[in-house]
């Protein structure tokens, strides 16, 4: 039986059916991933999709992976009830590997992912996601401010991600 990441259920109200979605996360065992980049990516995608982080590592297998589960800047997405979405839904288009969403305070979070086995360039004009003008950029994994701009061009390594917060 395959585990469904997203289950649909219906709620009848006033004789109308409304679709509701329940995020059912996979339990994450970071010790099963080969690189730190893959560990960051799996946690990032879960949080960008609006899901919680569920730890399945055991005390004897977690090793030094606890740091990935404790990134306060990334966990703030879950605390804020952030839910992002892919720029495009066509999985054959590389823009589908760019995710974005808006936090309750108006900041945007953008995730650049790379599912491929070789480095890829990703670019985004902020106007593509409804942002006019420049924003301050902060890398949420490196905990570094990266200046102010109205576009981003990044090289993302194989199975890596780059998650940034854009603020006024």
Task: Map each language-model feature to its residues.
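Short, solvent-exposed S/T- and G/P-enriched segments that are highly enriched in secreted/extracellular
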Residues: 148-152
